[in-house]
Structures are given as structure tokens and as C-alpha cells.
Amino acid sequence: QGYSSAASDVYKRQILEAAGKAGIPIPHLCYLKEINEIAACRMCMVEIEDMERLAPACNTEVKEGMAVHTNTPRVRQARKTNLRLILSQHNSNCTVCIRSGNCELQKLSHDLNIHFQPYPVKPERSKINLDTPIVREASKCVKCMRCVQVCDKIQGMNIWDVAGTGSRTTVDIKNGRTLKDTDCTFCGQCVTHCPTGALTVRDDTIRVLRALADPEKITVVQVAPAVRVAWAEFMEIPTKLATTGRMVAALKTMGFDYVFDLSLIHI
């Protein structure tokens, strides 16, 4: 089964984008349109007629008369090999990972039927720092460079950078600093675009529950305007039912002593 398209429909498009428009899925891990098209993961490899080597679909432009095969045995084997190499440097302890069930790497492993790992697994080891709202686990980083590009090209903050060389290449905070020593605004764009659990938002649930259980502590909630809107989506309830009164009642039922609305506070 094949698909043909007029050159005008896909002119100046990358193969990955053109295939997506035609309803043909091509797996990818590092690609972000016009932001990160560096073919770092090599998961989007395709076979092009009259070309000896496989080509990355994310940064190979469509040309008139080009015949592209996206699901040949050679292509599938290359993708499996590349994914296994990525997994050989990845902490695959998925059962305790916050991204389990919502992880692009995990989904790719299922889609490509990866059931065994022939390569030695040696994930990077580093201390997990919980001093800031954004937490990085280096052992789960797949070097896709999404965080680097999003922070540079969209946010303009240049917090993340590439460190090391060769097989020791990794992503780290620029100039070897800690995150709290940078100008990071903790906007969360790097977390949103990370395909794995390498970058996550710090979970303070246990600390909150301990505070609620401590009779000597007075607990206060400050609600920002955005929270009043977003909590309905998080709780999967209709917006019309997610009233401010209902949210406050829920927080008081949990045991919080005071609930303040930041939009009503005048300084």
C-alpha cells in the first residue's frame, strides 16, 4: 500500500511533516517543528529509493518524484536498534516514574515491540536536586535536546546546554551551575516538552499531607486566578461545576485552615 502526493501539497516540507499530513505515522522522539529538527534520536529513519543510506524524516526535505518507504523491514530494524541504544543509557524503572503511562519513550518501546535489551544498560548517575520546582533526573535523559531548544528559541532564557563529548554527551545547566543559581523563571516549558521523566515538576504532596496532619501547624492556601480555571481540567469535571466555592469547600474539607484568592488581595 502506498500514497502519492502532488509536489505542491508538500513543497518545502520535511518528510515527517508531509507523511503526517497524509495520515502516515512516522515515529519520532526529538522532533519539534521548526524548533528541534536535528535528528538526534534517529527514530524517524526512512528508506528513499535510489539512496543507499536511510534518511531522517524530520530534516529531509521532500523533492518532486521522491519515493519514500516508511515501514520496510530495514527501516523497522534500524528503528529498533536505535531505540535499544537509547534504552541502554536510560533508567527504565518505569513503575516508579511519574511519567509512566504518559511517556513518549515508553510508547515507542511498546509500538516497536521492544521486549528484550541485548545491550548493557548503563544509565547516567547523578544526584537529584529538590531545591527548585523543576526536578531533573539525568538517568532518564535521552539527549533529545528539546529542553535546550525550547528554552533558547521560545523562552529566550538559555538555561540548558550540551555538556561532555562523544558517548558522554549529556544535557546540563549551562556553565555547570545549579538551577536555583540561574535566571530560570520556572515556566515549565522544558518539562512540558520533555519526552520522558528526565524533567518533572517537584511533587510536594507528602509535605502537604504531613503539614495537614500536624495540629501545631496552620495551613494556608493561596489560589491564583489560573488555578480557579485549571482545576476543573485536572479533576476532569465540567467547567460549570468547578465553582470557586466548590474548590474552597474541598480545600477546607481536606483540613486547610485558610484559603485566600490572590486576585482579591490588595497591597
Q: Predicted regions span which residues?
A:
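Single conserved hydrophobic/aromatic residue that forms the stacking wall/gate
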Residues: 1-7, 11, 265-266
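Short alpha-helix boundary/capping motifs
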Residues: 1, 9, 141, 184, ...
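Short, contiguous strand/loop micro-motifs
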Residues: 5, 134-135, 177-178, 233-236
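Short Gly/charged-rich anion-binding patches and loops
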Residues: 6, 14-15, 104, 136, ...
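Iron-sulfur-associated redox domains of electron-transfer enzymes in respiratory
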Residues: 12-77, 87, 202-265
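Short glycine-centered, acidic/aromatic-flanked micro-motifs in structured strand/loop junctions
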Residues: 5, 173, 223-225
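Conserved adenylation A10 loop of the ANL superfamily
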Residues: 151, 266-267
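Fe-S ferredoxin-like electron-transfer domains
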Residues: 42-186, 192, 199-200, 204-218
